[in-house]
């Protein structure tokens, strides 16, 4: 906790610090956007979104009690089921990674929430339940405007 991870953010790994009182709402507010962004890049990479690590690589963790962990998994699956076109559940996974203190003792109810997105081929762009289309970039994600979608489709030939 409060130590820095050795790996860095890049196109296949995104760090997210949970802000606000409600950890679940914070994660749910962007999880579908990042999953869609990974699905829409035409690279054969596995993407990871890690909630509980800040942009400066500091491990902050996400506080989740037992009932919240179950609710988080259920709510993320529900949110991702709204992606269009639909994706199989094997395309993503949700893991809770324990966080340790400086003495290497597990901190109770503190986790890194890791959502892993596997490559999935489609001739279409994926969109969120709000019909928003995103692309993953080195610095995060970018919401595409209608003309950008057309340009991107044309470039993919």
Task: Please place each PLM-identified region on the residue numbering.
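Conserved N-terminal catalytic/coupling substructures associated with nucleotide/phosphate chemistry
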Residues: 1-157
């Amino acid at each position: 906790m409060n130590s820095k991870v050795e790996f860095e953010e890049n196109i296949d790994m995104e760090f997210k610090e949970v802000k606000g009182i409600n950890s679940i709402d914070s994660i749910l507010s962007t999880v579908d956007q990042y999953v869609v962004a990974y699905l829409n890049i035409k690279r054969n990479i596995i993407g990871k979104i890690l909630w509980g690590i800040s942009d400066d690589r500091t491990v902050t963790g996400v506080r989740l009690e037992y009932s919240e962990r179950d609710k988080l998994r259920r709510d993320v699956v529900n949110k991702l089921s709204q992606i269009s076109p639909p994706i199989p559940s094997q395309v993503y996974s949700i893991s809770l990674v324990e966080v340790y203190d400086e003495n290497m003792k597990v901190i109770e109810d503190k986790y890194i929430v890791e959502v892993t997105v596997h490559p999935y081929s489609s001739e279409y762009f994926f969109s969120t339940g709000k019909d928003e289309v995103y692309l993953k970039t080195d610095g995060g994600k970018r919401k595409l405007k209608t003309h950008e979608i057309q340009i991107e489709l044309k470039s993919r030939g």
